[in-house]
């Protein structure tokens, strides 16, 4: 069994855009820390970044399932390890 990849150009573009937004969120957190913003505000931004990263992860898992549905054991293993 080979590992599935993101072959669809639109899927790649969507994932790249998603990751760029996450990158921006993380930069915002770093800036907030430098600017001595409240812990509550920083935690809120971290929570948003974490949720966005989780969505990106589950999109990758979805890609695996769509491209190789018979690889359910591997998907289950990855979810147990990283999910």
Question: Where are the language model's segments positioned?
Answer:
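Solvent-exposed interaction patches of small proteins and small membrane subunits
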Residues: 1-83
């Amino acid at each position: 069994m080979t590992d599935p990849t993101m072959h669809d150009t639109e899927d790649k573009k969507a994932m790249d855009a998603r990751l760029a937004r996450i990158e921006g969120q993380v930069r915002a957190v770093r800036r907030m820390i430098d600017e001595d913003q409240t812990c509550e505000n920083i935690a809120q931004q971290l929570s948003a970044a974490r949720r966005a990263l989780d969505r990106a992860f589950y999109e990758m898992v979805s890609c695996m399932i769509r491209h190789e549905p018979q690889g359910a054991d591997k998907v289950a293993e990855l979810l147990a390890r990283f999910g």
